[in-house]
Amino acid sequence: MDQLTSAARLMIVSDLDHTMVDHHDAENLSLLRFNALWEANYRDNSLLVFSTGRSPTLYKELRKEKPMLTPDITIMSVGTEITYGNSVVPDDGWEAFLNNKWDRKIVTEETSKFPELTLQSETEQRPHKVSFYVQKDKAQDIMKTLSKRFEERGLDVKIIYSGGMDLDILPQGAGKGQALAYLLKKLKSEGKLPNNTLACGDSGNDAELFSIPDVYGVMVANAQEELLQWHAANAKNNPKVIHATERCAAGIIQAIGHSNLGPSTSPRDVMDLSDCKMENFVPAYEVVKFYLFFEKWRRGEIEHSEHYLSNLKAVCRPSGTFVHPSGVEKSLQECVTLFGTCHGDKQGKQFRIWVDQVLPVQVGSDSWLVSFKKWELSGEDRRCCITTVLLSSKNKTVADGLTWTHVHQTWLNGAAASDSASWFF
């Protein structure tokens, strides 16, 4: 978020479970498609916001399980916690706002009178959120009775039922919708109101997102009945809110294209990456394309062709260097030769590569320094290195004028590969 000096081109605010993340997609293909689209076209001028019912603990667990990007802003615990950036800096102003007419002690006291309510795990109990499980046929009556009792005791709370079993009690001012409204107001006060905002969800606790004025919305194809019913009753005449025909992250990509919010073709959907050209030199796009080619080569999804290797050598400066995360320095040309020998070595295996937080900085008239995290997943093994690449856009020997001059990598703490010899570029 701090890298933006002006209004974001697009702000995507997305739920995670069953929206951005498809738990029925073992290969995580729709998520990886979104990742490539975002990093290639949006990362340096837009904002990615994850809005989840998960607590910080469960959110961190999900990040370890799935190939997720790093968001600029994270809204957790059903809109009761807002944090910023890698350091997860909390928004103290939001926390203070939520204290109005909220008393957690009274909430726990009143809910303890209902044996039908089962407390969720301790990690899900937060300063401004008390969470339970409840059977679907009991939910509405309990919510009605609790609302009356809280009002009698001077509290102003909100009760949200979602997922057919989750019941969350929050301050009235909390929730995913209010958290989004707060963010938009804050960004506007800073002169950075996004040009467009797209809200994405699948369940009842996402409904509020679609109530914010001037916000585009997408209910993914697998949206739950509770959200569809809410939409039919409250937003069916809003042309900005659509019900996608694609599941999860694929539905988000579909919504970007449907509403003309920006590029909506993921580099992962391009069959021949060598023919994938941009009108102008876009460093982030080139980085994403390069590592996608690397993945496809090792998975044996493209043919073993000298044509591809020749093109790869052409974009690597003859005197260019690669500093391996282990500290060993090699020539880029030598790396291409080694790369050529590993064609199809991951065929039939779970092997994926994605890049995160691709941020280019122009350091000369035709030179760019691009920093990012490069992730590799091989079976159950996940490895990551912090990567810096020096690119030049002045190369008359190749069609798009691109030259890779220098690549430097260091292992991310706790994410080093046990077999460094198998780590390329």
Swiss-Prot record:
UniProt GO MF annotations: magnesium ion binding; sucrose-phosphate phosphatase activity
Any coiled-coil regions, as ranges: none
Regulation: Inhibited by EDTA.
Cofactor: Mg(2+)
Traits of the deletion mutant: Plants show chlorosis, inhibition of photosynthesis, reduced growth rate and altered photosynthetic carbon partitioning in favor of starch.
EC number(s) recorded for this UniProt protein: 3.1.3.24
GO biological process, one term: sucrose biosynthetic process
Domain of life: Eukaryota
Alphabetical UniProt keywords: Hydrolase, Magnesium
Pathway info: Glycan biosynthesis; sucrose biosynthesis; sucrose from D-fructose 6-phosphate and UDP-alpha-D-glucose: step 2/2
Reactions the enzyme catalyzes: sucrose 6(F)-phosphate + H2O = sucrose + phosphate
InterPro entries recorded: HAD-like_sf (IPR036412), HAD-SF_hydro_IIB (IPR006379), HAD_sf (IPR023214), NTF2-like_dom_sf (IPR032710), SPP-like_dom (IPR006380), SPP_C (IPR013679), Sucrose_Phosphatase (IPR051518), Sucrose_phosphatase_pln/cyn (IPR012847)
PANTHER family in the record: SUCROSE-PHOSPHATASE 2 (PTHR46521:SF9), SUCROSE-PHOSPHATASE 2-RELATED (PTHR46521)
Assembly behavior: Homodimer.
Family, per entry: Belongs to the sucrose phosphatase family.
Functional summary from the UniProt entry: Catalyzes the final step of sucrose synthesis.
Protein name: Sucrose-phosphatase 2
Taxonomic source organism: Nicotiana tabacum (Common tobacco)
